[in-house]
């Protein structure tokens, strides 16, 4: 009896510690800051000054570092997630907007919007390895789960570029709709979901054929077509449901990831931009740029359960477990 009680208490302590450790990081584009939110209480813990115009942010696989695109400083800042202090920088090209990290945490791929390049940085040495010429105004970057491929989207060229991570060369170009913003690999590496902001669509690309297998469009009663702008994308690990941020439409589209049918639209804050799951995928967090908040969505019930005020013009979001 005593041993069972001790084990139960230890389990409770471990669970509590894990919950307390979860933090949500939000980049505030016009606030030049990162807002840190407690993942359990959903209260703001800190607002941390960073570089100019922070946009894309990504968490290291081990959760120790948050990487921040300080776009107007032409650099990537490194934040220690335990101290919330900036501890270093990484080289990039001009106007870095989004980046992604290899699954083993050793390589970073950065889209530099103003020089039409993807910069490859070794995260161990913190030195650049190469610059890869891509299309005009590169934006989205997504690394495959096996680390063998990077997909970069170029906004003006309207293409998704497949880059071999061994050779750093483009092997395939896939034409998508106007102004592609984001590239998301499914957990099994079978598909890449590419959002097109002005096109208002998501192209689902088959990784085996490098062809578009389906194109998802969105229609919201009472919302002008030009306001429906697809931006951030997330697909759950089991490839059952997908979520698409629709920008000025102020909606998240819920999509059946098998049939590609839109099931529902969730009303969130104004100009919803980027998305991130909680590690257990029970919650989805959205950045709402014009209303200066994030929305918290219960993934099971498909309901918005809370709005959390953050800094001016929230852009990116990342979660530490």
Go through the PLM ranges and name each one.
Residues 4, 11, 17-321:
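Predominantly soluble domains enriched in secretory-pathway, periplasmic, or organellar proteins
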């Amino acid at each position: 009896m005593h041993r069972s009680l001790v084990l139960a208490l230890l389990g409770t302590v471990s669970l509590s510690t894990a919950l307390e450790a979860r933090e949500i990081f939000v980049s505030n584009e016009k606030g030049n800051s990162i807002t840190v939110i407690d993942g359990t209480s959903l209260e703001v813990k800190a607002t941390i000054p960073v570089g100019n115009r922070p946009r894309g942010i990504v968490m290291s696989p081990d959760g120790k570092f948050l990487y921040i695109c300080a776009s107007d400083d032409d650099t990537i800042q490194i934040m220690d997630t335990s101290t919330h202090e900036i501890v270093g920088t990484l080289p990039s090209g001009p106007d870095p907007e989004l980046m992604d990290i290899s699954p083993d945490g050793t390589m970073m791929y950065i889209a530099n919007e103003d020089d039409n390049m993807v910069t490859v940085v070794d995260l161990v040495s913190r030195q650049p390895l190469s610059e890869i010429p891509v299309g005009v105004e590169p934006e989205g970057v997504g690394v495959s789960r096996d680390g063998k491929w990077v997909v970069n989207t170029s906004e003006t060229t309207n293409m998704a570029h497949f880059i071999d991570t061994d050779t750093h060369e483009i092997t395939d170009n896939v034409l998508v709709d106007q102004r592609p913003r984001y590239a998301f690999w499914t957990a099994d590496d079978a598909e890449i979901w590419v959002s097109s902001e002005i096109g208002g669509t998501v192209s689902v690309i088959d990784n085996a054929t490098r062809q578009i297998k389906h194109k998802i469009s969105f229609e919201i009663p009472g919302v002008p077509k030009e306001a429906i702008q697809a931006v951030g994308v997330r697909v759950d690990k089991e490839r059952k449901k997908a979520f698409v941020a629709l920008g000025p439409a102020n909606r998240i589209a819920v999509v059946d990831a098998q049939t590609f049918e839109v099931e529902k639209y969730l009303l969130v804050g104004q100009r919803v931009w980027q998305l991130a799951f909680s590690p257990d995928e029970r919650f989805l967090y959205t950045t709402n740029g014009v209303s200066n908040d994030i929305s918290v969505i219960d993934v099971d019930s498909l309901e918005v359960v809370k709005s959390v005020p953050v800094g001016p013009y929230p852009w990116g979001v990342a979660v530490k477990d």
